[in-house]
Regions:
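Short glycine/proline-enriched turns and hinge-like loops at secondary-structure junctions
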Residues: 209-212, 322-323, 337, 392, ...
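Short, hydrophobic/aromatic-enriched beta-strand segments in well-ordered soluble domains
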Residues: 343-345, 411-418, 422-440, 463-474
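Short, hydrophobic/proline-enriched secondary-structure or compact coil segments at domain edges
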Residues: 295-299, 397-399, 494-503
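Non-catalytic terminal regions with compositionally biased, polar/charged low complexity
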Residues: 452-463, 470-607
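Extracellular polysaccharide-recognition and catalytic grooves
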Residues: 1-213, 217-219, 224, 361-417, ...
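Short amphipathic beta-strand/extended segments with alternating polar/hydrophobic composition
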Residues: 92-96, 102-105, 196-202, 225-230, ...
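Catalytic and substrate-binding regions of extracellular carbohydrate-active enzymes
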Residues: 126-129, 136-371, 459-461, 467, ...
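Solvent-exposed beta-strand/loop surfaces of large extracellular or lumenal domains
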Residues: 240, 353-369, 431-445, 599-606
Length: 607
């Protein structure tokens, strides 16, 4: 034989055309900065499991620490909680069936640390394992497990150090996390299964991806209420996968001219991250790590229709158990000639209502308008029970999950009306991605998916899709009393949006957004901003939140934030005064006083 060293070297370092070494494959698939593997979450977990098992085999049988050769592995295992929604299930983008996180890779990192005397690594991953699986280590200790000395693959029972306490799940996730190699961005305001909010945004970069543009999943009240649709009943060989589940209309996205599409599976269509707050970061334990406002602004080129699209999304936290989402989607063809832009939103549940935002009836009529007739995608013909109304009014849709305990869950959506707009209520094929998920409140396979569509005739850039979403339940009622969309004045032509969110506790949030961060925009209430996103929160006449997102000016009748170059600044009023975080130098005027912030501060700091 050639000796152990030869074979270790071959597996680790030697590659052929179709047989890659462990190193080459890891270099190809893992992002060394984020630890994320270049496939959808479902498949990424499988690869992580295999690599972690290799680590164990190398430790036990070859007495070689694989993590020294592949330092990305511990980082990759530590990054896996970033996939989690607050209900502890993974995101559903691409060909994924969401479920709980597989903890085997975490176990392997503990074993690797124990074998190689790495105390910090053992501490970190033991705390993580006890966090994800409170019973970990207990079962193995009780059983009298016989360990065969003959088997190459036998495990010894795992022994966890009793003095290492379970970590907190909040310490293993970030408020904003961006993984460019899968074009995926997540925002979250905490990890409370019932009360926290989370957005998962993705385009199509890497393997096992769909044609979905800038797609989103939205979380609320224990469930991913706005889910990704999944793969389909017949997996990759099925027509339902090829025509519907892998295509734009099954996702929460915007489809242009009825034709938006591109290659699925191994795809190379990512979005660009234009700006965000807070900055994307690896998870770390920190006080006050979840700010009351997060946002991201991403750009996507839709290749089939040659369209430019941006999506600005935000989580606004209004209390320990309350908050809402903001979604501003701009879309237009590069060369004009736009026929239509279709905004799709799918939600769990069994009932949907669609009315004008003031409560009046839209008189929805049955229609066959959403169909592949007209050389559109075949996916359109998968929608059924379609009803529509042509209206320029603001609308409100309510999606209801009838719960066994009668505490029904609702997603409330308000959308700005526009000229040449048609709104639809419809049913789509069932949400196959969640059909295997344990603990769902109804039979997912038997329930078509509630679907809202807004069709904008012509361009949807200067008339963007502007929506506010708030999850609620029968017992935890919605906190928003009204959402209106005030007119915005600007001397610069472009896409300028105003939103006013009134809440039952007396708080009112005013929001301004522009496609030009340097364009001064004015709302009738005296709010002025030059920003991608600006928010002024006012409770019973008192300022409580000021946020400037990628901007140089936010001005209200009693406060202002100014900067020479675009910055992100968050100001929050607390019992003992104002606190701030800022990405760069700026000047703040509050209560008649002026404060000069001389450098960026990422930790919440007293003004």
């Amino acid at each position: 034989g050639k000796g152990r060293g030869y074979y270790i070297d071959y597996v680790l370092n030697q590659s052929g055309i179709r047989q890659w070494s462990l190193k080459k494959l890891a270099d190809y698939g893992y992002d060394p900065h984020t630890g994320i593997w270049a496939e959808c979450p479902g498949y990424s977990g499988v690869v992580m499991n295999d690599y972690a098992n290799f680590t164990s085999l190398f430790d036990r049988n070859l007495h070689c620490d694989l993590t020294k050769e592949l330092p990305v592995l511990p980082k990759a295992v530590a990054a896996t909680p970033q996939y989690l929604f607050p209900n502890r299930m993974i995101c559903g983008f691409g060909d994924t069936h969401p479920n709980y996180l597989n903890t085997t890779p975490v176990v392997r990192m503990i074993e690797n640390a124990q074998v190689n005397g790495k105390e910090e690594q053992e501490k970190y991953f033991t705390a993580l394992l006890k966090c994800l699986d409170p019973d970990a280590g207990k079962a193995a200790a009780k059983k009298n497990v016989r360990v065969s000395i003959n088997s190459f693959f036998d495990d010894k029972p795992l022994t966890l150090k009793p003095d290492i306490r379970a970590g907190k799940i909040e310490d293993y996730v970030s408020p904003l996390f961006y993984a460019p190699n899968v074009s995926w961005l997540v925002q979250r305001n905490g990890m409370h299964p019932r009360h926290s909010l989370m957005i998962s945004l993705n385009a199509s970069e890497g393997n096992h991806m769909h044609a979905n543009g800038i797609s989103m999943e939205l979380y609320g009240k224990g469930y991913v209420l706005g889910p990704d649709a999944g793969i389909g009943l017949y997996l990759y060989s099925g027509l339902d996968y090829a025509e519907y589940y892998s295509q734009f209309p099954s996702h929460n996205t915007v489809c242009v001219d009825g034709i938006s599409s591109y290659p699925v599976m191994q795809s190379n269509h990512s979005f660009d991250l234009l700006s965000c707050f807070p900055a994307s970061s690896a998870a770390a334990a920190a006080k006050d790590k979840f700010p009351s406002v997060t946002y991201s602004d991403v750009y996507f080129r839709e290749p089939e229709s040659r369209a430019d699209q941006t999506r600005m999304m935000s989580i606004v936290t209004t209390g320990p158990e309350t908050g809402y989402y903001v979604d501003i989607f701009r879309s237009r063809k590069e060369r004009g000639g736009d026929k239509m832009h279709d905004y799709f939103y799918h939600n769990l549940g069994q009932e949907m209502t669609l009315a004008a935002a003031d409560g009046t009836d839209l008189h929805l009529q049955p229609t066959e308008e959403l169909a592949f007739a007209g050389a559109h995608l075949g996916a359109y013909s998968y929608l059924f029970d379609k009803k529509c109304a042509r209206t320029g009014k603001d609308v409100k849709a309510v999606f209801t999950i009838r719960m066994p305990d009668k505490d029904d869950i609702r997603m409330n959506m308000w959308m700005k009306g526009e000229k040449d707009r048609t709104v639809f209520s419809a049913l789509s094929p069932m949400t196959e991605g969640l059909s295997r998920t344990p603990g769902m409140p109804y039979n997912i396979k038997e329930q078509p998916t509630l679907t809202f569509v807004a069709r904008q005739k012509g361009e949807a850039w200067n008339r963007p899709f502007v929506a506010v979403y708030e999850p609620s339940t029968v017992k935890e009622t919605e906190q928003i009393s009204s959402v209106t969309f005030p007119e915005v004045e600007s001397k610069q032509p472009g896409s300028h949006v105003g939103i006013c969110v009134k809440q039952k506790n007396g708080r009112t949030d005013y929001i301004l957004s522009s496609d030009g961060a340097t364009h001064p925009c004015l709302m009738g209430n005296g709010m002025k901003a030059s920003a991608t996103y600006a928010l002024w929160g006012n409770r019973q006449g008192e300022n409580c939140t000021l946020f400037l997102g990628n901007g140089t000016l936010l001005q209200t009748p009693s406060a202002s934030v100014k900067a020479d170059v675009p910055v992100n600044v968050l100001l929050e009023k607390e019992a003992d005064g104002w606190y701030y975080t800022a990405s760069g130098t700026c000047t703040v005027t509050l209560g008649g006083k002026t404060y000069k912030i001389k450098k960026g501060v990422t930790k919440k700091t007293k003004l």
